Each structure stands twice: as structure tokens, then as C-alpha cells.
């Protein structure tokens, strides 16, 4: 599915029939971290897979956000060095990355486009609420790209937003570090927002995130 500098993700399909369950297969994601060369890691340090599993629990339990269900995680070491780690999660059915779900604005106003525009605004508002709740709890993701927000169809045209890939995130208690992490998350999101959202959409998104009706002058520099 994907490969990074130290990780590789694979999509797996498991047969439930052998366990006496329904015949519908279970789709899983396996993410493997490898620590080699300049990326090698002391065995006494937490493994990235362990950190990611812990952060999913924090995001779910402390922030009230949707995350993939973690089935297992583990690590392997040789001597004083970690060699690899893994995390196994359930696939979010029918989910698409936010950068695929929200295309660039269109000027066509067909009946379907009006519906899609309403759905688009709902998804963007939900994303603002998600990031606001996460930051209010003191958690910063650090790698908050659009591709790490997955949109899954819900009931009555109310999609659900899932947050992924949080191996670098953490709870920050010190106010200065928390503010730095918050701005880093917002900056990461805005890299794609500049290309996919209009200026008015970005202003509405920021108002929703901040919980204000009007932006103060110091807020407007974030949407220049």
C-alpha cells in the first residue's frame, strides 16, 4: 500500500469462515517499521508501533476521535538494538483519504453539485471539529497531512473522519511546546488546503476550529 523511510504498509485479507464467523473476509492493515543504518533505534526506547498504538488509544479515549481498531502490535530486537516492529489494524470500510474525498472547488452548479457542495462543507467542518478537539486535549499529531485523515461514508450523508498514522504524535503539557505543535499541525493541513479549498472555505474552517464568529487580526495571518 505504501512505503516510507522506515515503514511499509500492506493490506491483508483474512478468512473468517475458519473461525466459525460469517463468510465475509476481514480486511486488515499491517504496518512494519524497520530500524536499519542511520535509522537504527536503541532497544530501551519505545518502538514506533507501540507509540502509534498508544496514540490511537489517546485519540479515541481522551479526544473522542475515530481511529482504526488495533488488533496487535509488537517489536523485535537484537542485542541492544531494535530491528523491527509492527502494528496490525482493521481497515476502515469504504474510507478514502481526505485529499481524494475533497477535490478542488468546481464552478458547476448542477443538482448533484449542490449536494456535493453541502457534503463537502460538512466534511470540512467535521475536520475542523476533529482537530479542535484533539488540540484542546493537548495532543499534537505532528504529521497531520490530508492523507492521514480518512473519510468513511456514514448514515444520512454524514461521513465519519478517522485519523491515522500517529507514531510521531504526543500529549504536550508545556504550553510553549503545545502551541508549537498546534501550529505545525495547522501548517501541515494548510499545505493541501491552499490547493483544494477557496479562501472563504479556509476562513470558515479556521473560524470553526477556533470556535469564533469573526477572526481577529492575529488569526488572519494563518490564511494569507
Regions found by a protein language model. Give the residues of each.
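Conserved ATP-binding subdomain of kinase catalytic cores across diverse folds
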Residues: 1-108, 132-137, 141
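Short helix/strand-bridging catalytic loops that position acidic/His residues to coordinate divalent metals
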Residues: 39-45, 112-115, 167-178
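Alpha-helix N-cap and loop-to-helix initiation/capping positions
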Residues: 44-47, 118-119, 130, 181
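Soluble, non-transmembrane catalytic domains of enzymes that act on hydrophobic metabolites at membranes
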Residues: 75-78, 112, 118, 135-136, ...
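Hydrophobic residue at the +6 position relative to the catalytic HRD Asp in the kinase catalytic loop
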Residues: 144-154
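C-lobe/activation-segment region of protein kinase-like
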Residues: 158-224
Amino acid at each position: 500500500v505504501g512505503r516510507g523511510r522506515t515503514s511499509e504498509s500492506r493490506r491483508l485479507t483474512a478468512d473468517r469462515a475458519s473461525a466459525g464467523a460469517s463468510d465475509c473476509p476481514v480486511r486488515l492493515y499491517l504496518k512494519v517499521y524497520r530500524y536499519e543504518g542511520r535509522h537504527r533505534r536503541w532497544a530501551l526506547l519505545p518502538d514506533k508501533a507501540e507509540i502509534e498504538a498508544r496514540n490511537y488509544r489517546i485519540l479515541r479515549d481522551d479526544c473522542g476521535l475515530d481511529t482504526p481498531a488495533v488488533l496487535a502490535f509488537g517489536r523485535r530486537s537484537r542485542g541492544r538494538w531494535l530491528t523491527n516492529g509492527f502494528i496490525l489494524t482493521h481497515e476502515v470500510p469504504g474510507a478514502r483519504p481526505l485529499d481524494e474525498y475533497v477535490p478542488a472547488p468546481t464552478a458547476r452548479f448542477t443538482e448533484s453539485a449542490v449536494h456535493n457542495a453541502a457534503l463537502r462543507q460538512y466534511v470540512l467542518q467535521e475536520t475542523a471539529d476533529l482537530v479542535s478537539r484533539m488540540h484542546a486535549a493537548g495532543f499534537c499529531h505532528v504529521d497531520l497531512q490530508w492523507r492521514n485523515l480518512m473519510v468513511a461514508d456514514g448514515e444520512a450523508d454524514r461521513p465519519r473522519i478517522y485519523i491515522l498514522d500517529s507514531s510521531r504524535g504526543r500529549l504536550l503539557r508545556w504550553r510553549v511546546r503545545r502551541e508549537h505543535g498546534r501550529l505545525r499541525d495547522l501548517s501541515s493541513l494548510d499545505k493541501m488546503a491552499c490547493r483544494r479549498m477557496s479562501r472563504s472555505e479556509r476562513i470558515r474552517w479556521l473560524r470553526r476550529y477556533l470556535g469564533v464568529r469573526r477572526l481577529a487580526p492575529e488569526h488572519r495571518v494563518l490564511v494569507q
